[in-house]
């Protein structure tokens, strides 16, 4: 059975101590266990906010056909603001990347050394100063991210003999949720529009926001406000397996 996962850093286990607990790594193992089949998996970090996302998707799909495709919808393209994105727009991508590499080195020697103390406070102060003096921008506009997601959903809907599962985006957690609260109305509209596109084309939609709200302490299920913890990953896999058990020919015994 051929499985395509159009995932992200979260599906690959970013932030987890054990990346095998990430939903994108758990899913193939569970599919193999439940179906008794060998799972040939293509697992990508795929972001719809990039300029080449549509052409890249065509190259990936050309390696099919796939029995199952799972596409993770993300809003980070327009919700996550950064100084390096603004510098990149003003002075060019190369300068933006150079600035980002410098910030990463600074973070390595300050913020990432520990959770408490003056070092972390100095890191936060430096980032705040940069945000206030230089400004921030998203990776792409809301309109661009939305249109690309609609085009991707439409393209996946044209696949024949393929079970397509669309994973809806989740709101960010913890401190990050406060930082991006101004974009919340856009996120809710974005989620509703992409969901409507998926359901109109008879694709399976899994509401990850609703899954997150089932936890007693939602913020505790994130490792950093953006990436999810092990229990959340497990819940995503259970939801995917649940819909596939009802609808996938591969799992219901009528595989081609």
Give residue ranges: language-model regions.
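Serine-esterase "nucleophile elbow" of acetyl-processing enzymes
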Residues: 1-47, 51-65, 69-70, 228-229
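Alpha-helical cap/lid subdomain in secreted, periplasmic
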Residues: 55-230, 234-255
